[in-house]
């Protein structure tokens, strides 16, 4: 029992070593395990269920916007990558290749999918003949492989799970509308479902997706001040259409190239969620994706235990039938206090306590994981009270994350200011940029910060470049990033 208690309580404090805290939490909360293959993790049931809830809600949103799911091969011929020069140059260092199969050397190497623009471009060239075939709105749920040198579970792994949308349109206007529509789907999902505030904006040319005309992103701030790119949406223009000869007969009877988009997000969202909301007690899971939303713990002496457990089971059935993801922990080999610590560490949003006196009074106690608030509620109003507390937990999580971001969002007019904000204060900084790639590269070299995006709604507009002092073309968010 002492060993179990140690397992629950010993988590490295965030202020002492944030990276160690993160690893402690995801391991102790049983979300993942390391595999024998470097950079690849095993999703354990609780970790994978979070991803399932993300998939379920995002699928709903994709289908509302007219998209359908499909699946494309994991293996991509090398010749496909050669057709789009920027694309292959962007991904080549990370590509694993299959060179043999069945004991024979392959005539052409096959890349293990890093993303599917090339394969899907090839298929679209076969499927699209006329304007009547457009738009094509397809999403794929898949695994992808990018051979990362430095890995971190959920946030940066050699193999990861994601969704990638790929669409084809008659013209630039429709394709750009799609690009921004899906960026907004991501923003609304991450803020409304994961309780993570994000900054939406356009990537600088050096940070664009390989082969894109324009890339847009949502950026989230972790509790160590670093950024995570939580989702991207790309306008690809006609680049892939030309490379893969995706032409259609227009309404005017002319052969035209389609305009394409792609957009994606991944299991990085799980890592982001943990880093944004977790604390020194462990995980703090947003209610809408938590595998268990309510943990029910019967308490009291042995002589009343049978009756308390029986009533707990009745309330469990009521909550479950109302669509609440609920569990009962009626173990007798650990104390209620130990259970309280365990489920706080696992991030369960709401705890329900029921004892013999509560039964007599027709009440039970609800406890919020975030605020620690205890609320005595009538059992005949339990469903309403639980749903209300779950919504309160979500709202409080969002407000806390937003407050943290506001407190760690700075403004820099000189390189010295930016260095100080990156090294000492740690967070995001707004700074002016002249548009020269060399200045952007120098900022990274001297401060370790990269441009996250050019925000659509900056808190202020900068007039001079932080690096060279020339007039600024853009106001940019800079931060160190995962």
Model-derived segments and their meaning:
Residues 1-482:
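NTP/phosphate- and nucleic-acid-binding module
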């Amino acid at each position: 029992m002492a060993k179990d208690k140690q397992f629950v309580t010993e988590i490295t404090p965030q202020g002492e070593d944030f990276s160690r805290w993160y690893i402690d939490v995801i391991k102790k909360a049983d979300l993942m395990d390391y595999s024998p293959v470097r950079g690849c993790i095993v999703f354990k049931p609780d970790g994978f269920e979070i991803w399932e809830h993300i998939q379920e809600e995002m699928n709903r949103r994709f289908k509302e916007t007219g998209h359908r799911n499909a699946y494309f091969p994991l293996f991509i011929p090398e010749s496909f990558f050669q057709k789009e020069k920027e694309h292959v140059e962007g991904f080549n260092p990370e590509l694993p290749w299959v060179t043999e199969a069945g004991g024979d050397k392959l005539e052409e190497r096959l890349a293990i999918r890093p993303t599917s623009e090339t394969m899907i471009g090839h298929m679209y060239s076969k499927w699209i003949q006329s304007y009547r075939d457009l738009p094509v709105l397809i999403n794929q749920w898949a695994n992808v492989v990018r051979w990362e040198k430095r890995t971190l579970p959920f946030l940066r792994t050699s193999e990861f799970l994601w969704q990638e949308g790929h669409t084809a349109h008659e013209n630039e206007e429709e394709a750009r509308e799609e690009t921004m529509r899906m960026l907004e789907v991501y923003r609304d999902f991450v803020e409304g479902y994961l309780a993570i505030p994000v900054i939406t904006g356009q990537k600088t040319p050096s940070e664009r997706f390989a082969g894109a005309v324009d890339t847009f992103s949502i950026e989230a701030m972790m509790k160590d001040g670093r950024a995570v790119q939580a989702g991207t949406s790309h306008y690809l223009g006609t680049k892939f259409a030309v490379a893969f000869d995706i032409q259609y007969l227009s309404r005017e009877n002319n052969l035209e190239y389609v305009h394409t988009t792609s957009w994606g997000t991944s299991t990085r969202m799980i890592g982001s969620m943990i880093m944004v909301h977790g604390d020194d007690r462990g995980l703090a899971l947003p209610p809408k994706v938590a595998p268990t939303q309510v943990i029910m713990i019967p308490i009291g002496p042995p002589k009343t235990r049978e009756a308390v457990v029986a009533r707990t089971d009745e309330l469990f059935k009521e909550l479950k039938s109302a669509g609440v993801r609920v569990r009962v922990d009626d173990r007798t080999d650990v104390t209620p206090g130990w259970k309280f610590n365990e489920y706080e560490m696992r991030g369960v949003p709401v705890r329900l306590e029921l004892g013999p006196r509560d039964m007599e009074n027709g009440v039970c106690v609800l406890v919020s994981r975030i605020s620690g608030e205890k609320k005595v509620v009538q059992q005949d109003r339990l469903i309403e009270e639980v749903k209300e507390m779950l919504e309160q937990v979500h709202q409080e999580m969002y407000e806390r994350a937003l407050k943290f971001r506001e407190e760690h969002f700075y403004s820099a007019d000189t390189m010295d200011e930016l260095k100080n904000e990156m090294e000492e204060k740690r967070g995001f900084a707004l700074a002016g940029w002249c548009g020269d790639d060399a200045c952007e590269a120098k900022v990274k070299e001297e401060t370790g910060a990269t441009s996250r995006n050019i925000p659509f709604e900056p808190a202020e507009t900068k007039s001079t470049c932080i690096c060279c002092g020339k007039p600024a073309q853009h106001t940019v968010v800079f931060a160190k990033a995962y």
